[in-house]
Amino acid sequence: MVFVPNKRPRVTLFIILRIFLEHIFIDNKLSLVNPLNKIHLFAIVVVSIMMSSGLYSQVQGPTKPPKDLKPVKVSEEEYKLGKLSFNPKTREIWFPCRVNQNEVLLEFAICDEFRGKLHESLLSTKVTPFEIQIAMKLLRWVPSERQIYRKFDESGKPIGVLKDDGKGRMEILVRYKGKDGKEVTEPIGNWVHNVNTKKVVGAGSWTYTGSKVIDGYFLAAEDGAIAAVYRYEGSLCNTFNPGSDDDELWFPITSKVPALDTEVTVIFKPLPDVEVPDAKKLVPDGTIKTE
């Protein structure tokens, strides 16, 4: 069995642990001399290990897609699918989000509200990765097979370059009301920058990579991972900007990002495939091109 790891323990775990410790050591002024307290603490530790390693989700089984999820026609240019909408002509997808973080270190631009990646995501949404993935399939979005992770030699130095098939290019836009009350639409990449170089993620820098399924677990659904600024194979979408393989570089631009809980609409827009230089080209069957 392949474990589906969570990179950090879930936030709810820390809340439970804090309440437990307050009850044991503050309210009751007790110590671990009491055998019952030892049992309680042992249970907390076991749950901690399970949740942080992925065992918790293994016990629960794979996250299931929403039942009876069918597109409903609103007009010639809009269909509803669960909590999202899409345009069959432009193949654009849009859904409601809210500002979840506007100051802290980020690994994701968008996550759903139900999973463990929420504390490191710029935006959150009630729309699930399943809903988005189904809409993308209906609209014939083709995921890229470009390589997400670098290979390293024994000394830790990267080997070669990431290979790319040129597919899956997309833009992620945010639409919201500005301070003057007027509607603004701009790339979500304008809200996040590399703290060292000060360069923003920018426009048109996203790739639909489609997540992975391991032992029946759709990783995007297990983690709620929709769009990652720190590359992750479980995310539906990734950016490949310089530094996107480093989880300590990406922060919101506080002067750009609206206040916490501000409601925004996220728009996924497909872009044309791009031509990739031969040195970086990944041929369609997933093998690396050789001369």
Language-model segments: which ranges?
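Boundary at the C-terminal end of the N-terminal hydrophobic targeting segment
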Residues: 55-59
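Bacterial N-terminal signal peptides
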Residues: 43-52
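Bacterial N-terminal signal peptides that target proteins for export
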Residues: 21, 30-43
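Extreme N-terminal basic, low-complexity initiation segments
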Residues: 2-8
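Basic polycationic patches enriched in arginine
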Residues: 8-10, 18
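Long, low-hydrophobicity ectodomains and other hydrophilic envelope-associated domains
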Residues: 62-291
